[in-house]
Amino acid sequence: MEKEMLAIARLKSGEGKFEKFMGWMQSDKGMAVRKTIAHVEKTVPAIAPDKSYVMFKVSVHNEEEMKKFASGNNPIAKPIFDECIEIVQMYDLSKVKL
């Protein structure tokens, strides 16, 4: 079952954390992990003007693995999360009829 979620990741302070994290997310390794969790082609990113946090609207197909990934407990993603991510907050999204 596909589920829309919002992830807001606050980056640790320090030079180049944003670039390093986003580089990993777009790398072959990062894409492979993300594909096991969500439909990457449907992901919508947003970046804070000061690059202190990133936000992703994600179409999740494996919620348990998404929670594991976002909490920094995915074994492949753990090193980059430990180095670059301070905290991630997750939200369930639902469409609003207009």
Predicted regions: what they are:
Residues 1-78, 86-98:
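Short S/T/G/P-rich N-terminal loop/turn motif that feeds into the first structured element of a domain
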